[in-house]
């Protein structure tokens, strides 16, 4: 044992680890300085409110191996006076099914936090903390049979937090990924700006509750693959679901059982620019294996301007409720299909939705109610002119729909008249573009800049209606434009970065300026016949503010390409001027490096500790 100071110690044997944790010695940080295999259970001293077990010492990372036992007392055991137990920077091999830290099934342990940070774990179960909180950060977790001991869940917990770059896989045939008890209010939260992947090819996501609050915080991607969906029987499900701004959930069911892919008893809410893919990829799924079954009596389905939503099933309705479900949809475009192709050929340019509704220059808003047999619309913002060219709203029916999507592909159509020998434009990179006019139907491919063209032999006469539809294969997302020749082109923002983060390392000390972690770009296409200068402005709706209400005034600045620096506020500020296109359609890619564009100026402000600003 190497004593570092009165709070830190390094250990090299199981006995030394036991002494450091069990005795009232003041040690809060215990470092491994060798690989250790436990040869007895350890009960953490009651006077240690917080303890950290760190597997890295002097630049070397070590492995903790558990005992060959499945008894709760043969692991590291918490007591009720412990508050926070952190295991970090370590490799772990464990066969004990009570996890690395065993927290007893006792209401006295409510709120006890066990943290697994930057660990590589192979074993039967990572965490057992049924009434407490479990946090998993920046880790690789493999749940598998170990030394003949069958594997169970990743963890048993009440409030589970997952974040950072975390990958979790399970080959357990006995247990779901998570177990939550139903006598509290269980939750799972995916932290902001995280990238999390979870998979089981044999079981479901969770079991034990129909009250799970499921939250993905902003700018986070969560990819979940299961054999049989959310839960193993029709009772288990979520309470409220939140997919926050710019967050993404991909949830795939590969097999089936006679329960919905996802059952929910509360509200299902998606915020601005969020994304959802809810896919049942099993082709022979039964008709009652709905993608989402809203089971609560007061559920709401709130889609508040998400970037994209895709739900797919070969045979079952993607949405079902046997109660009255209120829906509120704000989006760029809605697509509904009566029938479904096989997944490998669905959602492409040859699988156009039977029904699509959208507005050309605004967001579509449509609200109403759904029950087991009827979809009703209580309000919408489509004009009479728009309704005349779109499907009848009597076809806006969720019942028996096998495919459903929200989202839009932008299309900039270049000028067309009787002197042109092509139809061209810009859209999403590598999209397929369906072009229809008169008796002509053609599909062309956009290049990696989004440019497409179709060469024609006969001139297009005036007053010809031309329909264009853009789709990236298998995306289920479409964009549509209908124009009449002659057409004089347009100015379009094709693509823009939606989020970025600031570096923690300043690029200037006086003033104290922080750059971005990566460059940002705008893609603008000007195809106007009568082109002129165009301008890009920047402004902020509110100053940077933390969850706790702390504000950074005048902290957001913009460094233009000519190095002029301006403070951003509620008033739009000119940041770029584009030139006219000289008579030819032109794409302009504006890129601001890490050291230009939006920057963070903390010369006259200070960040509060443990606060996130947005």
Say what each PLM segment does:
Residues 52-55, 82-89, 107-117, 134-138, ...:
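All-beta strand scaffolds that present successive hydrophobic residues in beta-strands
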Residues 486-614:
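Signature of Gram-negative chaperone-usher
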Residues 1-19, 274, 278, 296-299, ...:
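Extracellular/surface-exposed low-complexity segments
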Residues 9-12, 23-39, 50-58:
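Glycine-rich repeat segments that build the extracellular carbohydrate-interaction surface of secreted
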Residues 405-486:
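Ser/Thr-rich low-complexity repeats and stalk/linker segments
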Residues 28, 429-433, 464, 520, ...:
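Short beta-strand/loop motifs in extracellular/secreted proteins, especially
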Residues 40-42, 67-70, 95-103, 121-131, ...:
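Short glycine/acidic-rich loop motifs that flank beta-strands on beta-rich extracellular proteins
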Residues 37-53, 63-89, 93-110:
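Extracellular beta-strand-rich solenoid/capping regions of secreted or surface-exposed proteins
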